[in-house]
Structures are given as structure tokens and as C-alpha cells.
Amino acid sequence: MGPAKKPAMAGVNSKAEREADLVMGTNNSSIVSKRSVEMLYYSKPHFFRYFVKKPQRRSPLINRGYWLRMHAMAETVRKFMREPSDKPKFVLNLGCGFDPLPYMLLSADNDLCRDTTFVDIDYEKLMVNKKTAIRKTDEITQLLEDVEFLPDDSAVQIRSKPYLAIGCDLKNLTKLDTVLRAEVLPSECAVLFLAEVSLTYMDVKSANAVVSWASGLSNDAQFCILEQFFPDGPDHPFASTMMKHFKKLGAPLYSIHEYPSLNEQEQRFKDAGWNHAHARSLWDLWSDDEFVDGSLRASLDAIEPFDEWEEFALFGSHYFLLHASTRPRVSETATRTLTGLDPQTDKSGHFRLLAKCPPGSGQRRFGAVIPDSDKAVGHHSGLGRQTRLSSTELYTKSEGTTKTHEFPPGDIPARMCHTVTCLSNQDCLLVGGRASPASGFKDCWVRQGNQWRSTQSLPVPRFRHSAVKVTLDSEYVLVYGGKTSDGTTLNTWLAWSSKKQDWQQVETNSIHIKARFGACLGSINDTSGVLFGGIGAEGTILGDFFTWKLHQRSDGSLFMELTDHTDDLRRTSSLFNQIHRFGATVNQTAWGLVIVGGIVPRGIITHDKEIMLLDSTELTKCIASGWPSNHTIISALGLGNRLDGPRPLLVGHVSCAIDSKEILILGGGAVCFSFGTYWTEGTWLLQDVSSTTENDWTLIPESVEPNKSQSEKATSKPSAQSQNEPYRAAEVITPIPRVCVQNPAQFQDILAEGRPVIIEGSDVGPCTELWTKEYLTSAVGGDRKIVVHEAQSAHMSFQTKNFSYATKTFGTFMDEVYAGDRQYLRSISAEQPTKLPANLAVDFPSLSHDFRLPESLSIVTDNTHSSPLRISGPVTLWLHYDVMANVLCQIRGEKRLILFPPSDVQYLQVPPGASSSTINIFQSNGSVASIPHTSPQEAVLKRGDILFIPPLWLHTASPTGDVSVAVNVFFRNLSKGYAAGRDVYGNRDLQAYEKARNDIQKMAKSFDGLPSEMARFYLLRLAQELKDKAEK
């Protein structure tokens, strides 16, 4: 007889239980992130540690976002406790989860907490678990005077003098009200309610009932709620990404749709009986010195290098903190004013933004534009999907156009947040940038006469600086501000001379100007321009505005004349605060200075102000005539008269003036906190609405010519092969041997040999006969949702992402792929795709009995990591390697694979930290590319064949006829050394490699301060040592 089932909780059906579990699951993720913050940013004692079994260090963005959330809630409680009152005080945390805020405050501010009782309230199930954890933790129980742990079926789970824990569903307000009035609250008391991202998971009616009930619990009540909102509607890229995330978790946000704005949230509380309510975004609070003082903001950078400012601002702009009170209204809070547009400042009707957005095209952020011609530009370096890139993407205006000037060579280290400034004759200067925020670059590279070479380095590494061309006796590149590797915000001006090929310091007049990075620097003419925006040393966007003029003395030294026009522009322009920007791009056009994207202080850039125009002609007139008020200097272009594509996220982008009346925008996007990444894909062309030209700018598929280093170019003869021409066809391709494996010992010998073989004659089950299109559709289910790759060409590239991920039904996919569509399915976990590897038996149970590995491959079965199902149409998979060994079992159709031994990786254009090559091995004419110094091997798999692929063998695959169906089984062949943590796809590099890459960064950094040629000399010697060790 089996064990008796526990009775279900009274009044709670299984659906409600499941919903509650999903909501409680969001708390698990939240406290792991808060634990990460605690470990780094909080002094001991630590309290999250008792509720988080496996701590994880989150990214700097997640850490700072949760630091701000934690600070907001804690400061609100401290403010409440500091208020003078003759009543006992109670802090009621509604939906507290495992948050240990009471214990943290009792430990750090015991005197301040003397007259306050903390009451945690959440689901019964959660509070029982919390009680169990607290009971076992002396460090917490010692803080709780006269603590008593009550039975699980009691409403009050924990009772002590300073702290109580209550188990109650917030939808059961009758029970909660009874418990609080009978067992917790005296008749006269001051109450502060807390609700940190908890009520929004309730249906709106239930959440509003809590808000109304709370206003009547005490005549001296306050409410602090922290939740998400839509500062610019649900279609904003961050907002839409956030909403998809919570929906995918099964815990959608409800209140945000009913009360999307701050004004509506305030009115919600007033309608519920609260005398006054005031809401502010977290980004607004971050910028408030009274809430987070400047020294505290600056101190955070010393704990953890940070440069995710755009993403931090987007997060903070979508979360609000609202404070409401039932106390008599003393003075009405100032109403929120929005910067409106009038016919004089709204110029959106005069412009249009044309989008050309093929999915997966141009996914790159924080790069730089490489000038080429009026029909071609490059997008250099920056951050790709996986890592920083050293490559340059080519964009052209018409099909068949090729670049006319050289792009930066591949041996310039990958970087982001650098500048490239265009000079005459299509010369240009590349300056600085960074790897990590603690590892800036000071090297500089110049293209002159269509050749790239290094030039004098900066005095110190510099990134997030601003640069512009000026012309005096010759051309100069003027550089201002930025940050350096130790986190210092710079306030110096430098000028690089195209004649002398060196840097010189630029003196300035005595006017006070704050150091900054990410500022807007623009030209008005050859020697003068404007400076505004940027983030200062204390972590807020600056709101000043300067004009500058560069002078040259007779001795050749340079002098900068700065004039502060902040007050003048604030007085005469209603949109002045909309150009206080960080990370925007500025281009000189016939219309004036066009300011694109970035972030602004305290709020978000709304769609109607994404692109701004500063009329430099009007500005010059105003300066000359004493700033009359009838001039329109700043106007808004927004996103133009009509937007014919998805809304772009204009951060991390680049832009350039193609001609005096067209601006081309490329790249950009952001990591939307923990919700996912949004990419601004394709090309965007801003032009006058009267223009008749269309946006024909497009990304040319990746180059097939290997990047030659500068030294190779200097020593080799010019090649007749252009970058857009194919390789020669490989003449010698070794066939992979075919073998029969009859027992595990034979396969063990193959493993020890470490070379690929095709195993034939094995029994993999009835799948080879059964798995037709009709059978698979019926067995899997035609309505089942899957995610597939949809390719734009016959060759998929992981580097350029010339494909998109599409969610569709399995039946639709099978119809389309069998009709010849370029689609590819690599199955992922059906239950937890971001946490668990694919498992054919679990993900497709109806297929599990059809497929089996032969007994001779028992070592594979015993050490299996994952077993994805692969179904491919006429599309080629990119060249890549897997860290784990695997066997590829061909079930239906045929497939051709080309493999390269691990020693060939140095010739196959695999960027550092990546596992995929940039080369198309299968060329458009069907031949295999001949890559010098490599030894390609070929496998043609027929039905029932099993290809053993050893670890690190690079391989690419292409169907040779109809649809290919295969099962891929990855297995662990090492006892240790794999990457720590989660590895869903089995392709994370070994721990030793990742550690060594960090060591390389440290080695390179140790040469900071040396002349660049000396540093290069020694780094090349070290590289030779590494190569010698690798070849022993």
C-alpha cells in the first residue's frame, strides 16, 4: 500500500497552486541575484546566504540593477523609521519571499529599529519553508528577541518581539485582516506596507483589493510599491522584451496593462483611499543626490568595473517606486510635466526613417563606422552575440558594389567603445576603445594611402571618448573625455596631427567643465563646435552645454576656447533637456547637427524624441545676437513621419552622414536586464520626407577571404582573389574511413585513437524506416510549437547571424522544410531550454522507442550529455567545433560533412572565445574551399550510418538531397575539466582555456605604460613561447 496522499490546501485548486508556484519561482531567481549583490557590495554579516544554496555571481548589469532595487526598499524603510512618532511602527512586507530585509536592518541599524516591528507575509507554503530555514540559522534567531516557532497550520509562523512571519495568500484578505487585527497590530499604530514586484503577479482586481484594504488598516498608513511600468508604451523594445520574458516564465505581469504610466499608478492609489501618492522611476531616483548621493554612486565602480550604462538606464526607466500615504495632505506633490512638442519644435513631419531589416542581419553593438565611399561603409569591431569582434562588416548601397578602401586588418585586437574619425581622401584614424571596462586600449591606427598602420598611442588607455575632425594648418583629430582602465573619468583634450602623426595636449581656458565620458561632440565648422551630455564621475548624465573653438599659436601649440551656454539654451529652448544625452551619435548635415539615440537623465527617450536636431546656423546667430527668444535651435525629428519597420533600440548603434541630407544608422540594441537581448538589425536611413530614394543599404555576406595580418600584407604579393570572390576548390580531401564496431572494446580503441570514423552496419532501431514526414508529424504532434532556424541563404553563419529563430508548429515546419525551404531544426529541451540539454527520450517521448544506440556504443550511452534531434532542409551549417565528443546518427536522407583536425583551428578564422568559423567551407558552386595549411576530411552519411566526431574536430554539414533527419548524441569523454556551471549545448570551452584567456588579459595589461612597440615586441615573444609549447 502506497503512502497516504497529503490533503490539498483548503480552498486552493491545483491551477491556483501551479500559478502560485510559478510566482514563487520568480522569487528564487530574484534572491539569487540579490545574493550576488550582497556578496560584492554589502559588508558582513550576510543573510541571503541562508536562503540561497548555490550562489552565482551575476553580471555587472544585474548586480547594479538589484543593488538599486535593494537600496530603494531599504532607504524607504529607514526613512519611515526615522520619522518622529509616538505610535509603535510596523513594516508589513506583502509578498516578501525569502528577502531577509528585516534581519539586515536589525543587524545594521538596531537602534533605529527599536520601535519597529517587521511583519513578513507570503504564501503559506513559502513561509513554512522560510521558517524552517530560519529555525536552523543561529545568526538570524539571535536577532529575534523571544522568538517562537509555531505549527505549520498556524497563520503566524514565527513570532518574536521585532519580527513576525505570517503565511497567507494575499487574495485571502479576510483571513489576513483578521490575523493582523487580532494578533499583530494595536489599535493605534503607524504602518508601512512594502510590495516589491509582488502585487503585479496578481490579477488586477485582487491587487487593487489589497491596495484599498491597506488604506483602511490604519489612519497612519504608508505604502511603498516597486513594480514595472511602460514609460513609452508596451512597444518599446525593452518593454516588449520584458513582457515576453515574464509570459514565458508563466508568471505574466497584470497591473502594468491597467496602469501603464506613473500618473495612472498614482491615480490608482488615490482612487483606493490614499490621500496622496507620488511615483518616480528608479533611473530618476538614481540621479537624485538625496536618494543616492554622488559619493555612493561613484564608490560602486570601485567594487566592480561597470560600463553597461545604457542598459542600466533602460532597466531603471521601466521600474518605479511609488510612495502613498493616508496622512492629511500637507501640500500637493508637484505634477509631472512632460516636454511637449509644438509646430516649431516638432519636425518629424519633415523627415522619414526607412528601415531594411532582414532578421539576424548586422547584430553588432558599440562598434565604429569605417568610411569607404558614398556607396559603401564598414561597421568595425564592437560586441557581437558571443564576444567582441575584430571583423568589419561591409554595407553597400547597391548590389555588386565592393569596398574601395581597406578595412582594419584582423590583427588589430577586437574592441568596443572606440572611435574612427574620417579625414580627407578617405583616410581615417582609429582611437582606443576597450576590451573589458578594466582593460582599455591606447593604441591608435591610421589608414593613409589605403594602407593601415599603427601610429603614436594615447598617453593612457581611453574608451567612451568623443572625437571629431578639425582643420588648422593641417587636419587634426580632436579627442575629449572618456574613461581609462582604472575607472578614472577623463577631462583632457588631445589632438592628433595628420602631418606630424603624433598627439599633443590641448590647453583650455579657465572655464569650469566637469570630466565626462560618452559625451556628444560635434563640429559647426573647421575649427569650432559644441560639447554636451555625457556621464560625469559621479555616475549621472550632465546637463550643460558648451561651444568650443580651437586656436593654433605661432609655436604650433593648440588652445581650446570653451564658452558655457547652458543657461542661455535652457532659457530659450523648451527641448534643451532632451539633448542631455549619453551614448548618442552626432552627425553634421545640411539641416544642422543630427543627434541620434542614447539615453537621457531621469527618464527614457520617448519615440517622438529619439532623433533630435540642433540647428547650428540658428545657434551661431543666437550667440552673435545675444540669444533672442524667437529662434528654434533644438527640434525633434523622433522616428520620422512614418516608420516602416520594427522600432529600433538606438543605443550602442553607429551612424554616419552618407551625404549632406542622409544619415545611415547601423547596429545597436541592448541586453534588456535579465529578460533577453534586443538587437537593432539591418539598416536605417534618415532622409528628408521629399526624397524619392529608397533604403537600398544592405549587409554584404561575410568575406570569404581570410583576414591577413598587417605583417602578412607587407610580405605577400597582392592576391588576385578579391574579398567577395570564392576560394579555389580543394583538390585533395581525405575520405573518412568506414568501420564496423561489434563490441565496446572496439569503440574504446576508436576513442583512444581520437580520429573520426563512420560506423556502418549498426542497428539504431526502427527509426530509419519509420521516420517519414507523415510519421514524425503524427508522432510529435503537428500543433507542437518548436523553434527553428530560418536561413536567408544556403550557408548559415553564426558570426553574421544571417538567419532568424522562428517559433512555429512542428506540422508547419515539416511542410515547409519538405517543400524545400531553408530551415533547420536543432531540438532543445522541451521543459527548460535555458537550463537543461536536449534529451530525445524526454523531449520527444513518442519517438523514444524508435531510436537506440547499439550495445557496442555503451560508453556513449553511459556518459550521455544530450541527444538533440536534427532535421535539415537545403541549408549548410556553419563550420564549428564541439568540446564534447559526439556521434551523429543519420536516420533519413543523406548528409555530407567536411571535418578538420584540431590542429587546423589556427587557419580557419575562429575568433578568440568563439567556437564557430567565419569561413563558408561549402561554396556556392558546390566545391569545398581550399584553405591553405589545412587537411580536410570528408564523410558522406547514408541511412543508418553513425559518424564519430572526436572533441574539437571542426566540422560543417550539408544535405546532399532531400531532407536530412539525424540524432546527435554528445557524451563526456573526460573525467574532469569541462566548463563549470550550465552547458546546455555541450560546446562551452574547457575551464583551462577560459582561465588561460583571463591570464592572457592580465599578461597584456602588465605592459600598460610601455611604448606600444616595446609592448608589441614582448607580447610577440610570449606568443612564440606559447606556440612552441603547443607544438611540443
Swiss-Prot record:
**Biased composition regions of type Polar residues, renumbered to the chain:** 716-725
Residues annotated as binding S-adenosyl-L-methionine are: R69, G95, D122, D169, L170, E196
Cite the annotated pathway.
tRNA modification; wybutosine-tRNA(Phe) biosynthesis
Per UniProt, residues of the JmjC domain are: 833-988
Gene3D superfamilies attached to this UniProt entry? 6.10.140.1470, Cupin (2.60.120.650), Kelch-type beta propeller (2.120.10.80), Vaccinia Virus protein VP39 (3.40.50.150)
First-tier enzyme category under EC: transferase
**GO biological process annotations for this chain's record?**
tRNA methylation; wybutosine biosynthetic process
Instruction: Please report any disulfide bonds recorded for this protein chain, giving both cysteine positions.
Output: none
Name one molecular function that GO assigns to this entry: tRNA methyltransferase activity
The protein's matches in SUPFAM superfamilies, at most eight in alphabetical order, are given as: Clavaminate synthase-like, Kelch motif, S-adenosyl-L-methionine-dependent methyltransferases
Region spans: Disordered:
702-726
Keyword annotations for this protein?
A: Methyltransferase, S-adenosyl-L-methionine, Transferase, tRNA processing
Under catalytic activity, the entry for this protein gives: 7-[(3S)-3-amino-3-carboxypropyl]wyosine(37) in tRNA(Phe) + S-adenosyl-L-methionine = 7-[(3S)-(3-amino-3-methoxycarbonyl)propyl]wyosine(37) in tRNA(Phe) + S-adenosyl-L-homocysteine; 7-[(3S)-(3-amino-3-methoxycarbonyl)propyl]wyosine(37) in tRNA(Phe) + S-adenosyl-L-methionine + CO2 = wybutosine(37) in tRNA(Phe) + S-adenosyl-L-homocysteine + 2 H(+)
Name the EC number(s): 2.1.1.290, 2.3.1.231
Q: What does this protein do?
A: Probable S-adenosyl-L-methionine-dependent methyltransferase that acts as a component of the wybutosine biosynthesis pathway. Wybutosine is a hyper modified guanosine with a tricyclic base found at the 3'-position adjacent to the anticodon of eukaryotic phenylalanine tRNA. May methylate the carboxyl group of leucine residues to form alpha-leucine ester residues.
Regarding protein family, the annotation reads: Belongs to the methyltransferase superfamily. LCMT family.
Question: In its UniProt entry, what is this protein called?
Answer: tRNA wybutosine-synthesizing protein 4
Q: Which organism is it from?
A: Aspergillus oryzae (strain ATCC 42149 / RIB 40) (Yellow koji mold)
| Name of encoding gene | ppm2
